[in-house]
Amino acid sequence: MHDLDGRRRLIEQEEVVAQLLAGLLNAGLSTSDAIALGRVAAVKLGLDAVEFVDLGRSVLIQHGHPDGQVRTVSRPVGLDSINCEQLRALTLVCKQISAGELDIQTAPDAIQRAMSITANKWWALIGLAILAFCIALQVGANWMTALGPALVQVSVSLMGWIGGRIAIPRLFVVALQCMVCAVVAAGLVVTGLVASPGAVAIAVAWMLLVPQPQVINMVIDAINTLQLAALARFASVAVAVGGILVGGAAVIHIGRQFVDKVPDPTLLSLPLPLALFFSLIGAMANAVANGGRMSLILPAGVVGLLTAICNQFLTRGLEMHTAWAAGISAVLLGLVATFLARKLSYPASVLALMGMTAALLPGLTVYMGLATSFTGVSGMTEYLQAALVCVVLGVGVALGFAIARLILRKPHWEAP
């Protein structure tokens, strides 16, 4: 009877750890960081010899029982979304388990409550619209032109929701979003609701379709030798980029037939104080767009502002190339996010995402490629440069995390 009770307890412990790990991954944490938190929680809950196996889109836990049997627990996980508040709540649960405030009886309910937190879609829509407006101003659009990306982003988000509801494959959803944003942008300019060029709205919408959280987590997992997780995230990014290529090719081909006035590839440069201000506002809006509350909005503004100051100093003051400036700024962002995360309950990757999206995305480069494409000349150089910057951002942030870990002398398995 005693052996039976002990086995039941071990099974309960394994199920709790598996539930916690799956929750962290579904909320948007990298696999390596989720395993680090899960390992600490497992030890505190009484599982000393637990093995975590990376299987990409599923997580596997193996634990040896005293009778010599090895029990395996697996959970499917989604890697395509991020819920900042859910992630914060689950991180708090991990801290409470580590501090002994939660045990095997109380932890399951705490995990379930954390996983039940959902983001308000309408607030997320408002946050995305404000973020698109701020990015457009940083690209160089005037106030009336910047209204276009904000309105277009609403239609893009609605198209994404509809596609998700009727289970259209993501590749085609993204392609449809690319085409919808072009149609809406053209309609807004033709009706006079916003000022031209409408290509600014298209460029900003295309940039925001790139799943930047997946790029960050992909690099983190690759650095920590979790190849299957990194490959699964790479596939997610590739599907989104493939959709942009399909939809973008259709937009450019049709646009060449109907666009009489080719967009000017040069735009005005936003004054430095305004560039910094809208980076701050954009980061705060991005926090809202990703389900963040006031506890995230203000820190997001801080990291967005600091990242923008670094990037503007490098690009305007030192006239550094965009890719190099973005990479160096991303390293600083990773450092700041790690140290700030020590004071908050959000993972460093969440804070890094806020600052990156608001201050470092290569919106102007995408716009220049789009404007060049409408002239009949390939804009592939600009598109490849934009893709390079997106990858450099992920690598830079991951490097910042690694440097911060060395400074703090944290073990290699401990999450930043």
Predicted regions located by residue number:
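Membrane-interface helix termini and inter-helical loops of multi-pass transporters
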Residues: 193-197, 255-269, 372-382
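Core alpha-helical transmembrane segments of integral membrane proteins
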Residues: 117-218, 287-290, 294
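Alpha-helical membrane-inserting segments
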Residues: 134-139, 155-164, 180, 184-192, ...
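Structural signature of hydrophobic alpha-helical transmembrane segments
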Residues: 123, 136-152, 197-211, 262-278, ...
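Soluble N-terminal domains of membrane-associated systems
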Residues: 1-113
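Hydrophobic, membrane-facing alpha-helical anchors
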Residues: 93-108, 122-132, 147-160, 252-258, ...
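Membrane-embedded hairpin module used as a gating/binding unit in multi-pass transport
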Residues: 217-287
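C-terminal transmembrane helix-loop-helix hairpin of multi-pass membrane proteins
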Residues: 201-205, 217-241, 272-274, 298-416
